[in-house]
Regions:
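C-terminal cap of thioredoxin/glutaredoxin-like
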Residues: 6, 151-224
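Extracytoplasmic thiol/disulfide redox context detector
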Residues: 2-103, 218-224
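Sec/Tat-exported extracytoplasmic proteins
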Residues: 67-70, 81, 85-88, 115-119, ...
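Solvent-exposed loop/turn segments at secondary-structure junctions
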Residues: 70-73, 100-104, 131-135, 168, ...
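Extracytoplasmic/secreted proteins, especially bacterial periplasmic and envelope-associated proteins
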Residues: 62-65, 76, 80-83, 106-110, ...
Length: 224
């Protein structure tokens, strides 16, 4: 996990990070089911003093992944997260929130939301990670991001227009506000239902953080 006070762009780009082995997380082993009963507020997960805003529709519980494209741990977490999403509770409404711990994180935030707006996110999200962590290309400025997008076949003028658009700027601002609402201190991290927060710091591993997230998804229903 990259903590807010520890990272640097150069070190993150330089460390590819081994791809962690993901596991299904669907039919949990009995030991994991028993362990769920022992998850503790304050150690395994945190409860926000003030609820964070959510975008989940009625009847759904929002799970947010906080990430940074330059983070090797976020890159390694992708297969684990993909496996969890395939077997996550059906009432989960999942979304990602790119963080900004420094002003020079903003190009990655804008890239994410431009790809989303142009319908290219599913196709290119993982390729951004690959470009940074395997090909060792830095995408930490607007010109570098724009040049990369053009290589992916995206119209240069349309990308530039969207990159600087009001809608993308609004999403970037809201993502940073959400990060602050959850008091995110490192990535990857998970926010649940606008009320709960867990990460490798609390859970001791992101595998376990996903188990805790599954447990937390059920808590709003129990509390209702």
């Amino acid at each position: 996990m990259i903590k807010r006070r520890e990272f640097s762009i150069s070190s993150a780009v330089g460390a590819a990070g081994a791809i962690a082995a993901g596991w299904g997380l669907g039919a949990l082993p009995l030991a994991a089911q028993a362990q769920a009963k022992s998850y503790k507020e304050g150690s395994d997960y945190l409860v926000l003093d003030k609820p964070a805003p959510t975008e989940a529709p009625a009847g759904k519980v929002e799970v947010v992944e906080f990430f940074w494209y330059g983070c090797p741990h976020c890159n390694s977490f992708e297969p684990q997260l993909d496996a969890w999403l395939k077997t996550a509770p059906k009432n989960v409404a999942f979304r990602r929130a790119p963080v900004s711990f420094r002003p020079d994180f903003e190009p990655h935030q804008r890239l994410y939301y431009v790809l989303e707006a142009m319908g290219k996110l599913e196709e290119l999200h993982k390729k951004v990670f690959y470009t940074i962590h395997v090909e060792k290309q830095q995408l930490n400025s607007a010109p570098l991001v724009a040049a990369w997008a053009e290589k992916q076949g995206i119209d240069k003028a349309k990308f530039a227009e969207m990159y600087n658009s009001f809608s993308v700027s609004t999403k970037v601002r809201k993502a940073t506000q959400l990060q602050d609402s959850y008091q995110v201190d490192g990535v990857p991290a998970l926010g649940v239902a606008g009320r709960y927060y867990t990460s490798a710091t609390q859970a001791k591993s992101m595998d376990r953080a996903l188990l805790i997230a599954t447990h937390l998804v059920a808590l709003p229903r129990k509390a209702a």
